[in-house]
Amino acid sequence: SLEMIQKAIGPRDWTALYQQNPVSDDGDYFTRDMIQYFDPADLDYDRLRYYTAWDLAIGQRDRNDYSVGMTVGIDEYDNMFVVDLVRGRYDGFELVEKILDFYEQWRPGIVGIEKSHIEMAIGPFLQKRVAERRLHSAYFKDLKVGRRDKEARARAIQGRMQQGRVFVPEDAAWTSTLVAELLRFPNGVHDDQVD
């Protein structure tokens, strides 16, 4: 199957050969040697503290940006494991359901949502659906991006990656897309996962 081939050849060759999307070994901002991998079967998920962040975009057209939700687990040594990621183009109703489904799956301590006109637009519906789904323990926090550009916002994760403290799963369906976006940052068409 294609999943077996993807595991066998690795993310770099997979994106080049099967997705017609080659990526150089080293990017301008993130380099391939900064990307650490983990085997999800070997991770002790019970010892991690979970956090989720969302970069929102609304619209389903091909030219629209993606909405991205990412859940990370932090271990007792401050290592960060990207345990799950959802990326797609959704309307406002779908987006709210994705946010809440993701919360129910991982039960993060904090769900950060980028403060923007989109967050303000879906906020009342999100609150309504939280009540209807009885997810009262969910803690949502506005992520304020301020006036800093994407490169400035990415510096914290860049430093953590340089220290070898960020890990991505070696075989998740979304790993190759995430790695490709990291290596193209800040010059790629999409940077929603990095953001």
What do these predicted regions represent?
Residues S1-L56:
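ATPase catalytic-site recognition across NTP-hydrolyzing enzymes
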Residues T52, I74-D75:
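Low-complexity, glycine/alanine/valine/leucine- and proline-rich hydrophobic stretches
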Residues W54-S67:
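An active-site-proximal beta-strand-loop segment
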